[in-house]
From Swiss-Prot:
Annotated Pfam families: eIF-6
One annotated GO biological process: cytosolic ribosome assembly
Classification of source organism: Eukaryota, Fungi, Fungi incertae sedis, Microsporidia, Unikaryonidae
Protein name: Eukaryotic translation initiation factor 6
Coiled coil: none
Localization per Swiss-Prot or TrEMBL: Cytoplasm; Nucleus, Nucleolus
SMART domains associated with the record: eIF6
Organism field: Encephalitozoon cuniculi (strain GB-M1) (Microsporidian parasite)
Protein family: Belongs to the eIF-6 family.
Keyword line: Cytoplasm, Initiation factor, Nucleus, Protein biosynthesis, Ribosome biogenesis
NCBIfam families: eIF-6 (TIGR00323)
Keyword Iron: no
Subunit structure: Monomer. Associates with the 60S ribosomal subunit.
Functional description taken from the UniProt entry: Binds to the 60S ribosomal subunit and prevents its association with the 40S ribosomal subunit to form the 80S initiation complex in the cytoplasm. Is also involved in ribosome biogenesis. Associates with pre-60S subunits in the nucleus and is involved in its nuclear export.
GO cellular component: cytoplasm; nucleolus
Length: 241
């Protein structure tokens, strides 16, 4: 299942949203259009919030089915709201990190994470413990902002178009997923800013072309509605139990 939307006129969906197999975090908006769309199409808990009064929560946080990492700039009220809105077994943790746009410097699925090389060792340890993943300091090509220039689920990884074949192969072997280079929103290199995905759906910016969407659906293994519905039910049922 794949969709193309905008967030109050912006196609940078990844900047305003974080989507995992167990929850979705979305920036607070003036209209209810995006929230209503998510409530109708995403069968997991949704939390609408700000982080440090900023709506671009996708750039500020990073998580998976096990946990959610938020920057130290988040207010007590905001983190309490997030904790109360997510499943009880999802650990929400602040990180005291200089590079506090966590969504831009961390990229993960439910098993592995790659991070900006300049993150603190303490941050690396928290990422490993909270998200329950193996952690590697790894660029995407020449780009250290892995969350900006890559998008990842448990089946595949989309990377920016100037990622060499050698780097794609290296990432594929490291992450044990298929890795494909592509663009988003009609040619943008910032693929992480333009699409979010879990294991049964993806949401891309409204400017994304049909060709770009076909590449995205292929790398994330999101073709075949019946198979995706069965996958969604299996994952959601496991969460409920």
């Amino acid at each position: 299942m794949s969709y193309r939307i905008d967030f109050e006129g912006s196609s940078e969906i990844g900047a305003y949203m974080s989507l995992t197999n167990t929850y979705c975090v979305i920036g607070r908006s003036q209209s209810n259009n995006v929230l209503k769309f998510l409530q109708e199409n995403v069968a997991i808990p949704i939390v609408e919030t700000t982080i440090n009064s900023i709506r671009s929560v996708g750039s500020q946080c990073r998580g998976n089915r096990h946990g959610l990492l938020v920057p130290h700039t988040i207010t007590d009220q905001e983190i309490m709201h997030i904790r109360n809105s997510l499943p009880e077994d999802v650990v929400v943790r602040r990180i005291e990190e200089r590079l506090n746009a966590l969504g831009n410097v961390i990229l993960c699925n439910d098993h592995i994470a790659i991070i900006h090389g300049d993150l603190d060792k303490e941050s690396e340890d928290l990422i490993r413990d909270v998200l329950q993943v193996h952690v590697y300091r790894q660029n995407i090509g020449q780009e250290p902002l892995v969350g900006t220039f890559g998008a990842l689920n448990n089946q595949g990884m989309l990377v920016h178009p100037f990622t060499s074949t050698e780097c794609q192969k290296e990432l594929s072997e490291l992450l044990e997923v298929n890795v494909v280079a592509g663009t988003i929103n009609g040619g943008s290199q910032c693929v992480g800013g333009g699409v979010v995905a879990n294991d049964w759906m993806c949401i891309a910016g409204i400017k994304t072309t049909n060709v770009e969407m076909a590449v995205i659906e292929g790398v994330f293994d999101l073709t075949g509605d019946q198979d995706l519905e069965a996958r969604r039910r299996a994952i959601v049922d496991a969460i409920v139990r």
